Amino acid sequence: MAKSKRFPVMGNIEEKKCLNAKACPLAISHESNRDCLIMNVREPEITSVTDLTDKELTLRWKSIDWKRVKEAVNNLQSRIASAAKNGNWKTVNKLSRLLTRSFYAKLLSVRKVTTNKGSRTPGIDGVIWSSSADKMRAALQLTNKGYRAKPLTRKYIRKKSGKLRPLSIPTMFDRAMQTLHSLVLGAIESAAGDKTSFGFKPYRSTKDAYAYLHLCLSKKVSPEWIVEGDIKACFDEISHN
């Protein structure tokens, strides 16, 4: 049986070129040349994002095969988690750098921040990525080189009690950068983190917490009392210095 052709996505740490440069659907220079983005259209080689018109950027964004992008990112995340589980931190560092420099991961990060509930809320710079061209341009410009996070925008929303709850809103670029690095941190945490922590974690719910509590409290030597408490305005009052 003949083997199918495969493009080197992020499977190898060493630098490799596309197996068939002419057939590469997106030959565009960005921070890392490790990725050959699988799209549904063939494009000429572009040296910079400034060489692309909004129409060309829109075409590229709308032609992305998101299934392949997710598979590539998930594959590298699995390798990071496996290395973290085995305590191979040198490999974790190498793979983490690959992931944060990967164009696939950048595309996915931009997509996440532009499809969540806060995508229409700008940061201090007043910028939102609403068009396909904006999103593609953002992915091409997402880099750690010279990066400095901008100040947060402070806004308040009214709670059911009538009190105001403060919100600190980062810029779209900062949100995308946070999402990009969370792809690495999430993979490491899934393997090396606290297995009995259930709050604000993907694929875990209150039902998982209930099941663990039942397991802990159903033994003969289990505690007989549970004290529940609430620290008023905990995150606002706690010292961050």
Descriptions of predicted regions:
Residues 60, 184-237:
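Active-site-proximal segment of RNA-dependent polymerases
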Residues 110-113, 138-163, 172, 176-185, ...:
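Reverse-transcriptase-like RNA-dependent polymerase core
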Residues 35-47, 165-195:
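Glycine/proline-rich, flexible active-site/cofactor-binding loop segments
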Residues 79, 83, 98, 179-188, ...:
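Generic, well-ordered alpha-helical scaffold segments in large soluble proteins
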Residues 72, 88, 169, 173-177, ...:
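Hydrophobic (often cysteine-bearing) scaffold residues that line and stabilize catalytic clefts
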Residues 1-136:
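Non-catalytic, polymerase-adjacent accessory regions of viral genome-replication enzymes
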Residues 117-130, 149-176, 192-205, 227-228:
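Short, conserved non-catalytic motifs in the polymerase core
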Residues 122, 237-238:
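Switch/connector loops and helix/strand junctions flanking conserved nucleotide-binding motifs
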